[in-house]
UniProtKB/Swiss-Prot annotation:
Family statement drawn from the similarity comment of this UniProt entry: Belongs to the cornifin (SPRR) family.
Species per Swiss-Prot/TrEMBL record: Mus musculus
Tissue expr: Expressed in uterus.
InterPro entries in the cross-refs: SPRR2 (IPR029142)
Induction entry: Up-regulated by estrogen in the uterus of ovariectomized animals, with strongly increased expression detected in luminal epithelial cells at 6 and 12 hours after hormone injection.
Organism placement in taxonomy: Eukaryota, Metazoa, Chordata, Craniata, Vertebrata
Protein name: Small proline-rich protein 2B
GO biological process, one term: keratinization
Location of region: 5 X 9 AA approximate tandem repeats: 21-65
Subcellular location: Cytoplasm
Cellular component annotations (GO), alphabetically ordered: cornified envelope; cytoplasm
Sequence repeats: 21-29, 30-38, 39-47, 48-56, 57-65
Length: 98
């Protein structure tokens, strides 16, 4: 006789009453740390200190035009004047930046 046949011969029984499930205690609320204190901010940065703008470059004065001698009066024994050597300017100007 199988297990099912044995079950069939027994009179019907009401299903057992299950006890209500035992629940654990509800979870305690999570313990939060104290809220963070507001960050301590430093003073705003001062504006950067810039050096004074560069002064304009100091240029030497342009060389004065050469002082030319008057043309020599024509002379029969010296038809042409010798070339006049002009002294160079005392100050040499720096090359101009392009």
């Amino acid at each position: 006789m199988s297990y099912y046949q044995q079950q069939c011969k027994q009179p019907c029984q009401p299903p057992p009453v299950c006890p209500p499930p035992k629940c654990p205690e509800p979870c305690p609320p999570p313990k939060c740390p104290e809220p963070c204190p507001p960050p301590v901010c430093c003073e705003p940065c001062p504006p950067p200190k810039c050096p004074e703008p560069c002064p304009p470059p100091v240029c030497c004065e342009p060389c004065p035009p050469p002082v030319c001698c008057e043309p020599c009066p024509p002379q029969p024994w010296q038809p042409k004047c010798p070339p006049v050597q002009f002294p160079p300017c005392q100050q040499k100007c720096p090359p101009k930046n392009k």
